[in-house]
Amino acid sequence: LLAVGWTLGTRSEASSAVFFGYSTLRIALAGGLVLAAVLIFRLTRKSACLSAGLTGFFAVRERVYRALLLLSAALGVLLWSFLFSWLFVPANLRPALLWLIWTVGLAIALLRVGYRGVFRSESFRSHFRIFPRWEAIAPVQKKTMGILLILSLLYLAILIPSNLNGTADLEAFSRYGGDEFVIYPVLMDVMKPGETFGATLYHLFIYEDYHYGYPFYAVSTLLLTPVRLLTGAAFPDRVDLNLPILRMGVSVVPLVLAAWAIVYLFTHFRRPLVSALTLVFLLFAPGSLQNNQGFWHPDGLNLLFVCLSLVFIRRDDERFGRNFYAAAVCVGLSIATRLYGFFFAPAIAVYLIGAVLRKKATWPRAVRAGTIFILVMTLTVALSSPYLFRADARGRMIEILSEKSGEMAHGYEGDFDPRNDYRPGWAAWYPAFEDHYVRMFCFVFLWGSLLTGAFLGNERLTYRTVALWSLTITAYLVFFVAVKSTQYVLPALLPLMGGIFALPLTIEDAGIFSKRTRTAAWLASGAVFAAQLVLNLIRIRPRFF
């Protein structure tokens, strides 16, 4: 009733008023709220019957879990809608949205109180937990994670000096140049307060330069918010603080986390030495360092979303549960950031079909899971890209993407290209792979190892998913993209490179090969690893000395 009073508290504009000074929308909203109040009143008169019905319904504990999940999702969408009622959601909806937020929030609170025993149970926690409890992690996995943490911290420390380059002041930054100098003013505009709350939201979410998706600017904004609060009006000029934080927080740390995800995919952290060597192999690839030294860009974040998608698909193990839909969220974030998530389509399709063929799911269940996956992915893209809800912003985005797709297909107009690099095809792309990632002998060995794992052992799902992903995105780059930017290849080749020890791991896992064969596989992988690592270290030496 309070929402009804708020809705009718002010008259509509004269141009839209149709009845007693109110617009059709305002009258419809007030009528809907009155109807909701009447229905709620009628339900309260049948509270005993309703309570018994709900008790019977929630006797199946799975329904309690699902109800909490759906109510939480609804509350998130309602809060999002209320926030954006200052931008594109009709302001007249605010009273109704607040009432719904209150109602759904109250329902969640009552559900948590009424079924607190269920929510405190280990079965509930295990049902909703994405990552395992620390106590449930095996000692060897904890040991591996400790080693990886030490290596990662050393890596971050090594990269600090190179990420201070060009950050002394604005003049030094302008000389350093590059994409950062173009993107930085966009971020400063995103973080600039407006004269009104609505104007501030416009700056924050409708940033008008859609070369990169909003998750990139959102993470950058979160990282720099403490600096902005501390430095005040001098904030835009503090490149000595802002740039190192952005480079380390948006480029380096996400890539390191992505490398952890790749290592987990192939070792499950159960092989300390193999895990450590694989992490070093990934982090010291020339392409990784190109991204991690003086380069604030969205590609580290995008790589993290891609690798998390692969991890969640593997953890789901064709059950179509929470991990499968967590993968949908990560795929959506990759799409919202850099569009790469679209290239998961073949891998997801094969994953669904494979579950049916292996009798782990029926066709109707696979179709339902695939449909929900698409819905979750789409909702993630929409909610993480608020500008999509404004027609002018969508038009600007389409214009930019159209222009960018032409550049990707044909190269940057006016650029000096003496080697004729701006062309698609394997002959044009392979030198980029070789210079920044792996030589041909290692490339062939990696694919051979991955395909072996796709047909032998207990990790076939991992290898098939990684192979399909890598093949799809690599084929797109090779045959349709002319620009050879190093960071474009990160999501294609880094997961592939994570399989450097896949051959011996697969042969051991299969349990059908002799000790001599297992030893030969380890020696072969070790030789390829050592040779490629030495070549990469030689390649990256000028970056440090």
Predicted regions located by residue number:
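Transmembrane alpha-helix segments characteristic
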Residues: 1-2, 64-80, 147-152, 276-283, ...
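Perimembrane helix-loop-helix junctions
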Residues: 129-130, 312-322, 331, 343-379, ...
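Hydrophobic, aromatic-rich transmembrane alpha-helices
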Residues: 256-265, 434-463, 473, 500-503
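Signature aromatic-anchored transmembrane alpha helix within multi-pass, membrane-resident enzymes
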Residues: 69-75, 149, 329, 350, ...
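Extracytosolic helix-loop segments that constitute the early lumenal/periplasmic catalytic or substrate-binding loops
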Residues: 162-169, 176-211, 215, 225-233, ...
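Specific aromatic-rich, kink-prone transmembrane helix
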Residues: 39, 301-318, 327-331, 495-499
